[in-house]
From Swiss-Prot:
CDD domains: 7tmA_CXCR1_2. One of its GO terms (cellular component) is secretory granule membrane. Interacts with IL8. Interacts with GNAI2. This is C-X-C chemokine receptor type 1. Residues 1-39, 97-111, 175-199, 265-285 are extracellular. The chain crosses the membrane at residues 40-66, 76-96, 112-133, 155-174, 200-220, 243-264, 286-308. Residues 67-75, 134-154, 221-242, 309-350 are cytoplasmic. It comes from Homo sapiens. The gene is CXCR1. It holds the Pfam family 7tm_1. Keywords: Cell membrane, Chemotaxis, Disulfide bond, G-protein coupled receptor, Glycoprotein, Membrane, Receptor, Transducer, Transmembrane, Transmembrane helix.
């Protein structure tokens, strides 16, 4: 029987967030020169992302849930997106704790937390693509009735969550906690003799559905949306274009580096490019850094999609006015200013 699943072969300190151990029988552990430094830098970064995401996405959900009257289709997407980003962020403290003492939470939590992290990662990215489709339909095909879109949006969101659950099932099925000799306990996949094949599948899934497909959908939809805005004589088209550019640019800046490094790591693990301890350590550090950059996207979503929008600002001020934190006169002045500065409501929910 092959010994590729023998935990003592693996360099457990070299596992990145994806938790995929090497499968080669001649695999030899490498010394990580910056393990302690990297560990605490990652913990601090996780904590900051958690706090910022918790604050921003909670505010977005609060504002949308308060404004039951006149809730738009985009608001439904934003609500689901904020929920996905919030649930994703809630797993970060557990992963941060595992950086200190290893995985001390047992197999059940290993499976559940891994599933939560993956489901909300996929659903967040897929919902971003759905928002771009919604903006494309609203601006490029403005004849589509609001009633039709409101009826469909619930099923689209359910579809995103369902697809995300299916894409995440391998992590739930195969992950377990293990405490190897002379090393900290870890949460990783046990894939048996098919480790190499399944590793490629588990790498292809986030590459495809977590980056490439959503990116092409956004580029297509926002590309045609920009073309329509250029042709139209709309007072708010320049503002809308700035938001669209911000959406695509932030997505690329956050997730492109991680996907490129993950691709390099996959090529190295499958022996397409030569593997060495120095290269493995460099890629491991790059994965840590670029992964944090990707996680930061969950904090930036509220800023891009909600805080920039005039509807969100007005809804937030309305909640403050209801609790006596701002005057109703100030709220009325803000409403008049928003109305006179946005004769076309095309960008308010972008």
């Amino acid at each position: 029987m092959s010994n590729i699943t023998d935990p003592q072969m693996w360099d457990f300190d070299d596992l990145n967030f994806t938790g995929m151990p090497p499968a080669d029988e001649d695999y030899s552990p490498c010394m990580l020169e910056t393990e302690t430094l990297n560990k605490y830098v990652v913990i601090i970064a996780y904590a900051l992302v958690f706090l910022l995401s918790l604050l921003g996405n909670s505010l977005v959900m609060l504002v949308i849930l308060y404004s039951r009257v006149g809730r738009s289709v985009t608001d439904v997407y934003l609500l689901n997106l904020a929920l996905a980003d919030l649930l994703f962020a809630l797993t970060l403290p557990i992963w941060a704790a595992s950086k200190v003492n290893g995985w001390i939470f047992g197999t059940f939590l290993c499976k559940v937390v891994s599933l939560l992290k993956e489901v909300n990662f996929y659903s967040g990215i897929l919902l971003l693509a759905c928002i771009s489709v919604d903006r494309y339909l609203a601006i490029v095909h403005a004849t589509r009735t609001l009633t039709q879109k409101r009826h469909l949006v619930k099923f689209v969101c359910l579809g995103c969550w369902g697809l995300s659950m299916n894409l995440s099932l391998p992590f739930f099925l195969f992950r377990q906690a293990y405490h190897p000799n002379n090393s900290s306990p870890v949460c990783y996949e046990v894939l048996g003799n098919d480790t190499a094949k399944w590793r490629m599948v588990l790498r292809i899934l986030p590459h495809t559905f977590g980056f490439i497909v959503p990116l092409f959908v956004m580029l297509f939809c926002y590309g045609f949306t920009l073309r329509t805005l250029f042709k139209a004589h709309m007072g708010q088209k320049h503002r809308a274009m700035r938001v669209i550019f911000a959406v695509v640019l932030i997505f690329l800046l956050c997730w492109l580096p991680y996907n490129l490094v993950l691709l390099a790591d996959t090529l190295m693990r499958t022996q397409v490019i030569q593997e060495s301890c120095e290269r493995r350590n460099n890629i491991g550090r790059a994965l840590d850094a670029t992964e944090i950059l990707g996680f930061l996207h969950s904090c930036l979503n509220p800023i891009i999609y909600a805080f920039i929008g005039q509807n969100f600002r007005h809804g937030f001020l309305k909640i403050l006015a209801m609790h006596g934190l701002v005057s109703k006169e100030f709220l009325a002045r803000h409403r008049v200013t928003s109305y006179t500065s946005s004769s076309v409501n095309v960008s308010s929910n972008l």
